[in-house]
Structures are given as C-alpha cells and as structure tokens.
Amino acid sequence: SVEDGMCAAAALVCRLPWMCCESRIVVRDGIEDQKEKEEIRQLLELCDQDFVPPLSHRNSTSQTNWAETEEKTDGIAEYLENICSQHVVLWKEEGVVRAFMTWKDHFNCENLEAYPDSCYLTTLCVWPDYRGQGISEVMYAEAEKDIAAKFPGSRITLRTWSTNGAQEHILDKLGCSLVRRLKDDRGEGIDTVYFVKKEENDR
C-alpha cells in the first residue's frame, strides 16, 4: 500500500543520520573557536588509523618525506594545529562537527609543478556513522564553490595513497585526473598519487 511504502521510505531515510537531524555546512578561513577545534581533534583521533601513514605520525598536511614519520608523544596535536590555520568546510549536525575538509591556497610543490599556486585540498574526515551517504561529495562541492569565489582561476589539487579506493572513486566522479604517481612512496605497494580537478579546456 501507499502507507506501507511511505513507512519503508521513512525507515530508509532514518538509517541516514544526517537526513533525520538538523545539519548544515559552515565555511571558515581557519579555526579559532575552541569547541570546534576540540570536535575536530576528536574526529582526527577517530579517523587517525584510516590514513596511510596515520595522521598522528605526520608533522604537516603537505609532508613528502614519509621516512621521517613516527608516532609522536603528543599524538595528532601538531597535525591539528597545522589544519586549524587552513581554510575549512565543516559539516555540523545538531551543532557538532561530524565531518570536515581543509585546504590551502597558493600551494606549490615539486610534484605539482605544472599547477603553480593551486588550491590544495589537504584533509577530509567523516565520522564513521556518516560515511557512505554522499557527505564527502557535498564537502568537495562546497570547497570547490568557496575556492571559485575566493581564488577564481586557481586549479584545485590534492593527493592520496593508491590503496584508498573509496576516495579515488569519489575523485573520478568529481572529474579529477591523476597527474603524478610516486611508486612505493608510502611503503611497498602503496604509491602517493596526485590529482587535479579537470577544467573545460583540459585535453
């Protein structure tokens, strides 16, 4: 019946937490609010081991010498301070940060020499219960919109590791092209891969 169908649809929606509660996107040029900073810290700790290498073993969002990675006594504190000075897109539910994405402007590195002064997406974290629901795609779209408004004409770049299939699938859907691969950069069988957002005049 129609009633049964409506009940089934409602049940499906309520398996997606962010569709059942008040959620909103917040865009900032850095994090100063201590409550937001603490919520981001908790999210970083929760997602730490999802990254290769773990975030707690890194010293910045643009680190390239992975041989220097080691677990730090202060955990992710150094990494947290690094991202809080960057542009950020926050996904909040009921006023609590459940996902975030950060990016740098005027970014330059030798592995992206063909794309100088790009806007470089650095970190994306989504609370485990909120994954697989399209939030990552929304965050990418919001970052792209923010970049277009603040830095028109800048190319969008990012990197990940080759075994991160979930993110590479999203990047393909968003129209990003692989432009550099560093073989075994993060360990045997784990490459560092650089991407750039396609533009209309790209061939």
Language-model segment annotations:
Residues 7, 14, 20-21:
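Cysteine-centered motifs
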Residues 23-56:
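A short beta-loop-alpha structural element at the N-terminal edge
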Residues 190-194:
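Short hydrophobic/aromatic beta-strand or adjacent loop that forms the aromatic wall/cage
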